[in-house]
Structure formats: C-alpha cells, structure tokens
Amino acid sequence: ATVQGGIXYRMP
C-alpha cells in the first residue's frame, strides 16, 4: 500500500 498524490492504492 502506497500513498501518492493523496491517493492510496495497493501494489503487488
């Protein structure tokens, strides 16, 4: 899980 540009998203 990473936070970038105020958006949290999951990465493999």
From Swiss-Prot:
As recorded in UniProt, its EC number(s) are 3.4.-.-
User: What's in the GO CC field?
Assistant: extracellular region
Which GO terms fall under molecular function for this chain's record? peptidase activity
Influence of temperature on activity:
Optimum temperature is 80 degrees Celsius.
GO terms for biological process, alphabetical? defense response to bacterium; killing of cells of another organism; proteolysis
| Keyword Phosphoprotein in annotation | no
Q: Tell where it localizes.
A: Secreted
Query: Which keywords, in A-to-Z order, does the entry hold?
Result: Antibiotic, Antimicrobial, Bacteriolytic enzyme, Hydrolase, Protease, Secreted
Q: What is this protein for, i.e. what is its function?
A: Peptidase. Has bacteriolytic activity.
What name is this protein filed under? Proteinase L5
The UniProt record lists the keyword Secreted: yes
According to the lineage, what is the superkingdom?
A: Bacteria
Subunit info here reads: Monomer.
Q: What does the UniProt note on pH dependence state?
A: Optimum pH is 7.5.
